[in-house]
């Protein structure tokens, strides 16, 4: 079972996405902010899903940069899917090292398919 760290400050989104991914066989650790995501990374993960816009001034792209720069306990090459309701954030996410970028709202099946492709190689 692949372990996914889901970083999103919207509790409704987090609950829905977690349940749907769990139904598809993923283990999901939901984190509402960057600090909790960094702590969760220390317990191992196979991929991250990070919202670009988090509460309290947190920026998901900054979390992505810290992962890629080895400033967390996560593997710097771990797959990271960035999400945002603002499609203009995609370029910044890509430049920061996002593996994929999804514009909200997206279908749950799309997210599960993207994760499977990244983790299973196809």
Enumerate the language-model features and the residues they cover.
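Short acidic/polar segment at the start of the alpha1 helix of CheY-like receiver
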Residues: 10-14, 56, 89
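Two-component/phosphorelay signaling modules centered on CheY-like receiver
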Residues: 11-29
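Acidic, metal-coordinating helix/loop segments flanking the phosphotransfer/catalytic sites
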Residues: 30-47, 55
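C-terminal output helix
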Residues: 106-115
């Amino acid at each position: 079972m692949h372990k996914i760290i889901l970083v999103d400050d919207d509790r409704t989104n987090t609950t829905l996405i977690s349940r749907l991914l769990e139904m598809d066989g993923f283990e999901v650790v939901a984190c509402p902010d960057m600090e909790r995501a960094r702590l969760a990374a220390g317990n191992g993960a196979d991929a991250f899903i990070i919202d670009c816009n988090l509460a309290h001034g947190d920026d998901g792209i900054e979390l992505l940069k810290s992962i890629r720069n080895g400033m967390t306990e996560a593997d710097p090459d771990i797959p990271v899917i960035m999400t945002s309701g603002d499609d203009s954030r995609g370029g910044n996410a890509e430049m920061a090292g996002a593996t994929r970028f999804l514009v909200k709202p997206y279908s749950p099946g799309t997210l599960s398919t993207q994760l499977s492709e990244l983790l299973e190689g196809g």
